[in-house]
């Protein structure tokens, strides 16, 4: 089975790259058994990232070699198969590998790290932690220690322990010493990891100077503040350097923070939102979130805002042109999906647009238009990825009848099957009803069990004392439901003997309002959601807790849209950066944000569990590669430069060799 390349998280890709550093050459006597031209060919394939070909060659040469070279080459082949995405090939070699000699600790350590990395890929964090013991000593070569700490960083991150993940990255940074290129990548990932923590957590846990971690945490807080003016950020960084004068942060890294902030600034922003019609309340929530973020900037640095009514679809292009004539340097909106589609058809777009929705056709593209929305499709795909990482293979799908349920089910199914998972059964329920026993029985094959028992009773001519059984081949249920229906569906699934099946669902299951009594029936459900909704922090002026005092609506059904409004404002200074640097992410209220090659913004969300009626964060979605959907409708020359033949990978800079 080949691992889909999108399954590689940023840190795990870093681990695989570090294998190249940690693949220690055999001693001279062992190396002499391998012809120089063969070693040269293997190294060339590895340098060119032709991992599949390199792994096949290594395995072939190993089969023709004698011990101890045979074992060394088999191990390198197993590592390279995993780089190529072929876990089963790697495992088949691991199972027959033993250290060629008892006095080769490096071989045994590499084998243990490889087993760990496979456990991480499978989502078996407990096994991965067991394999990490014992930790390497000072005598262990630095490349192997780097690999160990990269593994630990990923294990902690997937467990939701971002601070400990950052500590491991800090150790890696110190171990790299004079390798400035790799240190820049590690430092970027370190600050991004800390920036995903809440402001409250950063402030409470930050140690004072001269602590290295304290310095990184303060830098992360500066990054999160979204300081608008480069001069102000330069002053803040200078003050930071005075406080942490011996901190290992590279000057090149600090300079990169300044460069990003200076990439884009607009003094005049036009906001296109409907002021009447069915989307008025949605628009109001987005607008209020946008304004809340705008008010956080000092008065002298706030851009001019001008609002335009976009209620009438037919006026979309005229309103855009009117905004430009009145001096707009950036346009935010429209909200209507059809209006976004109209703008995408424009041949010339003089000023950039941050649209507040995403069109159905994922390949429609304009280099000056960015699409941002709370797409349930992103959630469905991340659920598929999480379930796969946790080792599940057989899925059941239960969604409401209608367009919304169809779209979510289809996106989950496509992503799940792309990863290699199987959909055993897919059923729909009528959301206007309260009794869902019929679709549930079909989903769980209980209706077939009933039919078999009735047929047997007819054959025997007597009533049988038997219990209907649900199917036993399913690993989990993917469920899409609004809060009220979710509270009805979960007990009914339990009644039909599915209480032990894990249930994964989208954010729609959670109202966003803490209600232990009503949500008690949602026990043992895992879902993805906006971090801002789940994190209870008081130190940040833009936290939900603080904004709710000023805007009561923040606590209602449109809460996630306030977060979207905040991110919409803060994104404006980062769009060019995200476009120019594929793989870059920024920490937002709606999640960790990144841009794909079609200028569609994606969100990496928080994972939460419902226990005793209360939602609590358990971790964060893995940083996957950016999805690609074929060629854009615009000419290829209009696309931003991307690696790998234009296929933008959603990998942090730390993953680049």
Name what the model sees in each region.
Residues 106, 281-286, 296, 300-362:
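Beta-alpha junction/loop-to-helix N-cap segments that form part of ligand/metal-binding clefts
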Residues 330-428:
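Extracytoplasmic ligand/sensor domains, especially the bilobed periplasmic-binding protein
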Residues 546-617:
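Segments of small-molecule ligand-sensing domains
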Residues 18-37:
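Bacterial Sec signal peptide processing site at the extreme N-terminus
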